Structure formats: structure tokens, C-alpha cells
Amino acid sequence: MSETWEALRKKARSTENSIDVKLVSLNKLTASSHGGFDIDEKTVSSRQTTFRTVTTEIEGLIEQLTNINDDMNDVAGAQSSASWASNPAIQHTLRRHREILRDYGSEYRRARDNVDQVLQRELLLSSSNNESRNPAVNNRARGYDMYLKENDHINACDRLLDEQIEMAMSTKENVARQGINLRGISNRLHYITKKYPAINNLMQKIKTKKQKNTMILAGVISACLIFTIFWIIN
């Protein structure tokens, strides 16, 4: 199982490096923004195509990294009684990879929203520039300010939703971590009872004594109830 763990760990690091590269490419779309009003519509369309391609690739890599982390959790949880899996460094590694995944998710959503907002603004400005060249429809360009404000409002709502999703993912990770700890405790107890038969026998005796005490108590209560009923009737 240690070989499987090492293979998953290497795969996780490789996927994390790929996400790093893609995030840099995504942020470059914001850095290369013209920022002015003289924007060509074809250029904006090309940047939007690149944006969709990069975001799709990053989402696929994040999903892949999530699956790898789940596999690592399963391997460590199933072998928690083994010497290598009980090493605190293993739990630290699991926790570190989950934190990296969460940070990548937050960074991706932030960069995606920023780039999408910039591209939407550039698209509106490029459309406005094309229409403003025609005097007959020049007055239509005034409405784009309203569209830009509405777009900012929608992006703000998206950011709030992303924050809620991030909180839900954090809760899920905490629950999964607690489940792994509980499975580890259960496996260790099972291992101890097998390794030390005396402890297992003692636990069985305690369980048997509890059952006997319960039966005696039930008999005493039943006798008292029967005696009370006869006393009331008589």
C-alpha cells in the first residue's frame, strides 16, 4: 500500500504543478487587457476563446486533483493500523494537499471572475465603438454604461455564491477528516483486541456482566410491578 500512496502523491504534485501553469496563463489574460476604449471586437473574441479553453482545462485539473486526494484519504484510512499510515507525517501530508486544493479552488474562482468581468467589459466597449461609428445609432452607445453596472452586480452575486460554495467544501473536508480519524481509531481498537487476547476477554466479560445486570434489574422491576398490582387489587 505504501507504493500506492507514493504513486498517488507524485500524481498529486504533478497535477498541482499543471494547475499552477494554467492559473498563470489565466491571470495573463487580465494583464494583457487593453484597458482603453479602442478595442477590436475580433481581439476580444479571440481572448474569450482562450479564456473558455483555459478555464475548462483548470476545472478538469481541479476535479482530477480532488479525486486523487480522495484516493489518498481512502488508502490512508484503510491502512491506518499499518506502521507507515500511522506516521503523523502521513496525516500532515493529507492535510497539506487538501489545503493546496482549497487554495487552488479559491484562486481559480477569483481569477476566473476577474478575467470574465474584464472580457465582458471589453466586449461591451468594442460593440459600443462599432456602433458609435454610425451616426444613426450613436445614441445607443449610452445604454452600455447601464449594462456594465448590471454586469458588475451579477459578478458580485457570483462571488457571494463562490464564498458559500467554498464554505461548504471546507465543511465537507472537515467531515471527511473526522471520518478518517474515527476509522483509524476503530481499526486500532480492533488491532489491539486481536493482539492482546486478555483485553478482548476482559471486554467480553464486561459485556456479559452488563447483560446479566440488565436481566436482574428487569426481573426486579417486573416483580415489583406485579406485587404492586396485586396489592392495589386486594
From Swiss-Prot:
Q: Which GO terms describe its biological process?
A: endoplasmic reticulum to Golgi vesicle-mediated transport; inter-Golgi cisterna vesicle-mediated transport; protein transport; vesicle fusion
* TM stretches of this protein: 213-233
- Kindly give the Pfam families that the UniProt entry links to this protein: V-SNARE_C
Q: Which GO terms describe its molecular function?
A: SNAP receptor activity
Which InterPro entries does its entry note?
Answer: Golgi_SNAP_su1 (IPR023601)
Stretches assigned to the Cytoplasmic side? 1-212
Locate the coiled-coil region(s) and give their ranges. 54-121
Which residue intervals are topologically Vesicular?
234
Lineage: superkingdom: Eukaryota
Instruction: Tell me how this protein sits in the membrane.
Output: Single-pass type IV membrane protein
- Gene Ontology CC annotations of this record: cis-Golgi network; Golgi medial cisterna; Golgi membrane; SNARE complex
**Subcellular location field:** Golgi apparatus membrane
Keywords linked to the UniProt accession: Coiled coil, ER-Golgi transport, Golgi apparatus, Membrane, Protein transport, Receptor, Transmembrane, Transmembrane helix, Transport
Function (record text): Involved in transport from the ER to the Golgi apparatus as well as in intra-Golgi transport. It belongs to a super-family of proteins called t-SNAREs or soluble NSF (N-ethylmaleimide-sensitive factor) attachment protein receptor. Cooperates with ykt-6 for proper expression of Golgi-resident proteins. Required along with ykt-6 for normal embryonic development, seam cell division or differentiation, and ray formation.
Family as reported in the entry's similarity comment: Belongs to the GOSR1 family.
Quaternary data: Component of several multiprotein Golgi SNARE complexes.
Protein name stated in the entry:
Golgi SNAP receptor complex member 1
